[in-house]
Amino acid sequence: MNNLIVEQANFIDGKRKYLICTNHKGMALIQPILEKLLSKNYSFDFVFIGFDSTPEQTKNNLKTWLQNQKMGSYLYLALSKEELKNLRPLIEEIGFFEDEVQYVGYGEMHSKVFCCRCHSLTQLKNLEIGSEMKCQNCHILLLVSDYYSTLYDAYLGNIANL
């Protein structure tokens, strides 16, 4: 999931319609996209997630909104990295593929690394692909690979020194 979240939104031209979903903190990240859409007079829908929205309300409202969109729409989500991580399965379930969505995130994200030796999961903050870390169970030094398992919701950690 780390490799899908960007910290700066990139404008993708030529889409049928643009969908923007953000909260107060994500607004600054998505502002350049809004300005481009307005200057080009492109069609877009905008959904703002307020402070008083619970995660369950957010999921239900987002699901209803996205299910009513037409094919050819492009989605920008500008939320905290943890919120993006939690919403991604819902977005994919609705039918948006990786090339139809930009996850623009802020803040820290907790990721897991799967140890190839003892098969335990170690949780880390702001994981970097290619970095080394110790397994919390067997204490072996692992090299974090870019292979991500959706089954375990974790990156594969290979033995760093043989």
Predicted regions and their residues:
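Cys/His-clustered metal-coordination modules, chiefly Zn-binding fingers
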Residues: 85, 89-162
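FNR/FR-type flavoprotein reductase catalytic core
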Residues: 1-111
